[in-house]
Amino acid sequence: MLSQTSIPEVKEDVIGYALHQRRARVGQFQDLGPPDLITLIKSLPSSSSTTTATASANDNGATSNINGQDPTTIVTELHSHDKLKGQIGTFFYCMGIDTSDPTSITIFAKKITDLFLDTPQIWFGKKKHFHVSKISISSWNAFRKYDVNIIVHIPGTVQTYIINSDGEQSQLPSVAEASSGRNSQDLNVNMIWAETFMSGIVRDIMIMKDNRADGESQNLVETLIFNPFTSGELEDVANNFIKLFPLVYEKGVYLDAPTHVLNPSLTNNYLVETLVEIVRLTKSLEACRKMLKKLIEIHPEAVIILIRVYFACDLEIDAVDLINEQLNSPSSFLADDSKTSHIQLIFKSELLSIQSEFLLDVKRDYKLAKEVAMEAVNCAPNEFKTWYLLTRIYIKLNDMSNALLSLNACPMSQVKEKYVLRRIAPITSDENLHLPLPLDASIEEISSLNPMDVQLEQKSADPNLVNLSASSLKSTFQLAYKLLTEIVQITGWEQLLKYRSKIFVMEDEYQGSTSSIDEAEVRGNDISKMRSKRLCERWLDNLFMLLYEDLKTYTDWQSEQLYFDAQNSKYHKLTVEWELFGLCAKRLGHLPEAAKAFQIGLSQRFSPVCAKNLLQFYIDEHKRIRRDSVSANSELTSSQILSSINDIDSSIIDLVVKICCWNHRWYIEFSIILIDALSVAVQDMGITKVHNEIASRFSDPVAQLIDDNILNFLKNFTNDTFDN
């Protein structure tokens, strides 16, 4: 639903400011890089007679002389910092557009410029009939470390440049010129476009998947996010990604990997994560299987990716058969003596980790899972995930001593963070931010929510809640803390402390013991006990303190609520405080209590934090009921199960619609969480019934928004998986 009001813009003080800032920072871009940057040059009708003519003359001049000029001069002229009369420059970031070739980008650019042709724009409260004379789109090629800049003149030419990590600029020939083979450098043009497209899709998917636990949050308000799967201008995006995957397979390690992967490999990186997620979402199994089987002939280790795809598509038998074949067959790639033992051990640990995770989560064969996980640790002792899985298994086996020892042994990443969007062009003044309110689809409780009121509420919240340090944990520390909370749920705090004192010596105790030898001789028995203990890592000691803070907060909250309930009095808290209570309970694994807090918060006003966390709770409840319904020990009747499923589906639909409208309010038209959530209801009810249910509860524009952003994807981009 692209419209003038769906585009956030930042006004430039000087035309070309954003491009200049981006180019100055090209050498600092890392891994996946920044989102695409779109800049516009707009002119007002009062100066159209002169400005348009000048722009047209400049465009024609640039076209006619382009082969005879230095590319640096051309780019400088195209983005001059001289602010012409009647012209302004604006920019915004964008994700989800099709950057597979110049034609697709030009089509998208035309859609943007067409928005301003006939309809005046409400620009800071005044109607302005802008004409877009120039638009540029910059997209980071993460494989080659190039920034690809496409400049579209309205009307006129399309020009493309690349800026390498050293800031050097050069013109990129067109695809047609490359096909004619005018020089050897042109042969790379198609590859550059393929890499640029793949880089963009990886960013689009990973910004959602990497931040899923945080509700897919992103803090760049001047960012417009489309669904990449429905944005293909010339080809199906998912099929195109699968087709091009082999071309960049060997470069996947350059993109880095999720935070729990400390050492990216060919089969464990952001590129592979994206492929698996795309196949899971679009149900493109057959196309992917065909591609991977060909790739395996050249790169046998790619069988690990195929196994992951099988699990993602619920083909557990096929996946397990492949794992057993690779681990036990003499023809397996693991038996290839031509590969170094280190590389083989990495691949073997990945296979074993997949196998142990399956035994742990699906088969619940914890003893066998432990044997497999221990072998995975032996193969890759420097990887976090192998130790993480082993710790989880010890917890399931109720072996808390070994669980704590394994947790203490986890290799931690001090610097690695999730992929997040970073501002490349600083906003010089808040007054330059133009953030229109999309009016095409809105719900009163969402559109009427005043951000300033929410900020005041946050400032008024209980500091003890706001300052809970566990909420700011990142990377592997966040995952390790989750394991510690699982342990304390079983043992309780007092028993956990006993386990800690039994198996660990704390750092201050250790330092004290080594500084007094004479005293140690007197306390021989104590020293002997200390030597049988492990030194508790400082980071784990810190997690114990954070856990104590969370437990104290949770206990005080529950006690207060019980007191007020006993007095038949209402327990008054701000919505932001209910958010924080819910998040604290969720961290500690008290999910029903967390859900109750989120529900109370939503009853007071709309909160995206409460809504997204409550939605995830309903999805998990739906899975639990479905799983229990096929269990021989299920105590629910079929009618009770059906009633529970219907209630949950109804709640899911309600939350999905409201979150989708909230996202639309902030220029976000793509969410994997919402796609997954609504697909649960669609699986039960069918697309048509879900659409009718939404149409009966909400306005036509809101129903159309859900159709455009979610149901259209489920109907037309999932290979006929869902019934109408």
UniProtKB/Swiss-Prot annotation:
Disordered, as annotated region: 51-71
Alphabetized GO MF terms: small GTPase binding
Alphabetic keyword roster: Golgi apparatus, Membrane, Protein transport, Transport
GO-annotated biological processes: chitin biosynthetic process; Golgi to plasma membrane transport; protein transport
Biased composition range(s): Low complexity: 51-65
Stored Gene3D superfamilies: Tetratricopeptide repeat domain (1.25.40.10)
Region (CHS5-binding): 711-724
Record's bilayer topology term: Peripheral membrane protein
Origin: domain of life: Eukaryota
Entries under Pfam families matching the protein: ChAPs
Locations listed in the record: Golgi apparatus, trans-Golgi network membrane
One Gene Ontology term, aspect cellular component: exomer complex
Role: Member of the CHS5-ARF1P-binding proteins (CHAPS) which mediates export of specific cargo proteins, including chitin synthase CHS3.
Family to which this protein belongs: Belongs to the CHAPS family.
Complexes and interactors: Component of the CHS5/6 complex composed of the 4 CHAPS proteins BCH1, BCH2, BUD7, and CHS6 as well as at least CHS5 and GTP-bound ARF1. The complex interacts with the cargo protein CHS3.
Other comment: Present with 3460 molecules/cell in log phase SD medium.
Protein's UniProt name: Protein BCH1
Species whose genome carries this gene: Saccharomyces cerevisiae (strain ATCC 204508 / S288c) (Baker's yeast)
